[in-house]
Amino acid sequence: MKENEKVIMEKGIHTDFKENMTYGEYLQLDSLLSSQKRLSDHHDEMLFIVIHQASELWMKLILHELNAAIESIKQDKLQPAFKMLARVSKIQSQIIQSWDILATLTPSEYIEFRDSLGQASGFQSYQYRMIEYALGYKTPHALKIYEKDPELHARLHTALHAPSLYDVAIQALVKEGFPIHKDVLNRDITQPYEEDATVEAAWLEVYADVKKYWNLYQLAEKLIDIEDWLQQWRFRHMKTVERIIGHKMGTGGSSGVSYLKRVLDQRFFPELWNVRTKL
């Protein structure tokens, strides 16, 4: 060691792990970091794989928080739910940044390994589908995509039949005494939610008297945050796809950019957007 070289290792730092769990063992890094298996020899396929795997990890956390928030709202514990939903929004903002990295992939680079994907596509992401279900956008026909894996198909079937975040938010309105139409309360929750005048009237009253309905107002704003971030994610997705493959058909069989543009018009919480015009 050179005389002017400083020792940066503190005396108390643990170095003997013969009988103790290490950082890598706790995070199962051997398994995690060996999951990036390229199907081509092209350098940039690693970027493509890592971006999508990282997004799936973030989506796992989103589902963890959304499901917990739904249970909290069911139990009238809105304050803990607010923290969970705020965390979801932060995660969404993080995922959006990943499109900047993927956009460094040029069309010429992508076509070098695109055929290796076969028919695999982000459209088949079961976690993204479960997020849509948790937010209330139910698509029963999409379950066919997952028939290859019976266990996964069963999980999605359960998610399809579970009340969404918006379903429990509407129940919170009912508990506060708002008269919500019975057709909304008894609807088939396996189908996409359709806006309702009584739900809109309830939210309008919440926004008109924020002090009286503070918790419901906060819940509504948390929902708006999540949908806002999701729409930003969808827009960045669409523009990144357009930048890389133009208007070619997607690997999953969709029309590509044209399909992604149509998706931008989907609303999860329509009445919460409508009240902004009505106030």
From Swiss-Prot:
Q: Which cofactor does it need?
A: heme
Q: Which GO BP terms sit in this record?
A: L-tryptophan catabolic process to acetyl-CoA; L-tryptophan catabolic process to kynurenine
- Provide the reaction this enzyme catalyses: L-tryptophan + O2 = N-formyl-L-kynurenine
Q: Where in this chain does the entry annotate a coiled-coil region? A: none
Q: Does the keyword Metal-binding apply?
A: yes
| InterPro entries documented for this protein | Trp/Indoleamine_2_3_dOase-like, Trp_2-3-dOase_bac, Trp_2_3_dOase
According to UniProt, this protein's pathway is: Amino-acid degradation; L-tryptophan degradation via kynurenine pathway; L-kynurenine from L-tryptophan: step 1/2
Enumerate the UniProt keywords alphabetically. Answer: Dioxygenase, Heme, Iron, Metal-binding, Oxidoreductase, Tryptophan catabolism
What's this protein's function? Heme-dependent dioxygenase that catalyzes the oxidative cleavage of the L-tryptophan (L-Trp) pyrrole ring and converts L-tryptophan to N-formyl-L-kynurenine. Catalyzes the oxidative cleavage of the indole moiety.
- Quaternary state and partners of this protein? Homotetramer.
Spell out the protein name for this chain. Tryptophan 2,3-dioxygenase
> What lineage does UniProt assign to this protein's organism?
Bacteria, Bacillati, Bacillota, Bacilli, Bacillales
